[in-house]
UniProtKB/Swiss-Prot annotation:
The keyword Nuclease is annotated on this UniProt entry: yes
Keyword terms: DNA-binding, Endonuclease, Hydrolase, Nuclease, Restriction system
Enzyme Commission numbers on file: 3.1.21.4
GO process annotations (BP): DNA restriction-modification system
Organism: Methanocaldococcus jannaschii (strain ATCC 43067 / DSM 2661 / JAL-1 / JCM 10045 / NBRC 100440)
GO molecular function annotation: DNA binding; type II site-specific deoxyribonuclease activity
Catalytic activity: Endonucleolytic cleavage of DNA to give specific double-stranded fragments with terminal 5'-phosphates
Protein name: Type II restriction enzyme MjaI
Record's function text: A P subtype restriction enzyme that recognizes the double-stranded sequence 5'-CTAG-3'; the cleavage site is unknown.
Record-linked InterPro entries: Restrct_endonuc_II_MjaI (IPR019068)
Keyword Hydrolase (UniProt): yes
Length: 222
């Protein structure tokens, strides 16, 4: 007889159930045996193809509630009920994922080692530097928009939350450059930052920069 539950040695009243034991308790079929890395690849293909999205296989959290209301309990009850309700869903999801795997295969056949090296360089060197220097890029762009110049903040200015200085007509304007997420999370931002706020938000292929606070200041002092 298979031991389904094993007591933990360090504390009474606590047990552990392995995933294999769980499948046996619920009388589920054995976990499918797949080649190495296959599960991860199939899952990735599913993400890209959206094979198991609700529009294809149904909203599972709601379906299981609906199933329980029928009085069904066993896996076979669930399987029969689901396949009657969505007779083509498994095949449709399989087809979507399989097609995406074939797309992966075609791409892999075209890839060369140098392509992988370029990807690694882009991640480790370029994107890391880009993330660190994003504030400088924003500072430069905003200064250009305002017809002025800029300089990086000093160590003392940085300690006050100043990320850079915009220079217009020899007048220095300290600014704080923060992400929209950061601004939304900070309750007392105006009390902590000494510079005029520039807010940025990263989108898929661009960065949205809101310097309206600074623009109002510049226009009102002309």
């Amino acid at each position: 007889m298979v031991k389904l539950m094993k007591k933990l040695e360090d504390k009474k009243g606590i047990i552990e159930i392995t995933f294999e034991e769980e499948r046996e308790i619920l009388e589920l079929p054995s976990k499918p045996e797949l080649p190495k890395y296959a599960s991860q690849l199939i899952n990735l293909a599913n993400i890209f193809s959206q094979g198991t999205r609700p529009k294809v296989v149904g909203q599972m959290s709601e379906l299981i509630k609906e199933f329980r209301k029928t009085g069904g309990r066993t896996f076979e009850d669930w399987k029969k009920w689901y396949l009657q309700k969505y007779p083509n869903a498994i095949d449709e999801a399989t087809e979507k994922i399989w097609n995406m795997l074939n797309n992966f295969k075609e791409t892999l056949e075209q890839l060369e080692r140098d392509d992988v090296r370029k990807w690694v360089e882009d991640l480790v060197l370029i994107k890391t530097y880009e993330g660190l220097m994003l504030q400088d890029a924003i500072l430069k762009k905003v200064a250009e928009e305002l017809g002025g110049n800029y300089r990086p903040s000093t160590i003392e200015e940085e300690s006050k939350g100043i990320d850079g200085v915009i220079i217009i007509d020899d007048k220095e304007i300290p600014v704080s450059i923060k992400s929209k997420t950061y601004v939304n999370q900070e309750k007392h931002l105006s009390e902590e930052l000494k510079g005029h706020l520039i807010i940025y938000e990263k989108k898929k292929n661009k960065i949205i920069v809101d310097y309206s606070d600074l623009l109002d200041l510049v226009e009102n002092t002309k």
